[in-house]
């Protein structure tokens, strides 16, 4: 497993998905095989998304690397993640923000949230809080956030999330620009407003927003 993991990370560096050594180290530390169903563990270090139940997936490693690089996560950051899924992405971010940082992650499917919570706790990630709810509304009690990462595609960028981002903060979010076509946005909040960079076409499950 370790050898497969090292090979995957070497490939992600070679392909340009991983740029900072901190990201390589964080992904090296997190056991992705513990975040996928047992029958798929042998595929944990293939660069592919995998089903995790409840119609959801764990993102491909290259996408996790790409998103945390785009978000420019730093030690001490307070991060909001929308769409916990398996909890793998949160674990990688927890490694990057360190004990002085914190990751708040929201999942709307209670069984996935519970499983992620148990897994993260068992692995000693005390700097992650798993919440159940509608992630498109964010989590105001801990706002504002240095970084917000959304792992499901929105029809438009939720206003609540923009409000909960600090000035100087970064949000990385897939947006469905037209039916069947999603683009990953990097949004930087400035004192005047927002700077939006369109990064690349992506394919995520839809962000479910409760009315």
Curated annotation (Swiss-Prot):
Catalysed reaction, written as an equation: [protein]-L-isoaspartate + S-adenosyl-L-methionine = [protein]-L-isoaspartate alpha-methyl ester + S-adenosyl-L-homocysteine
A GO-annotated cellular component: cytoplasm
One GO term of the biological process aspect: protein repair
Subcellular location: Cytoplasm
Disulfide bond annotation, renumbered to this chain: none
Keyword annotations from UniProtKB, A to Z: Cytoplasm, Methyltransferase, S-adenosyl-L-methionine, Transferase
Molecular-function GO term, any one: protein-L-isoaspartate (D-aspartate) O-methyltransferase activity
Active site: 59
Entry EC number(s): 2.1.1.77
Enzyme class: transferase
Family listed: Belongs to the methyltransferase superfamily. L-isoaspartyl/D-aspartyl protein methyltransferase family.
Primary role: Catalyzes the methyl esterification of L-isoaspartyl residues in peptides and proteins that result from spontaneous decomposition of normal L-aspartyl and L-asparaginyl residues. It plays a role in the repair and/or degradation of damaged proteins.
Name this polypeptide is given: Protein-L-isoaspartate O-methyltransferase
Organism: Ignicoccus hospitalis (strain KIN4/I / DSM 18386 / JCM 14125)
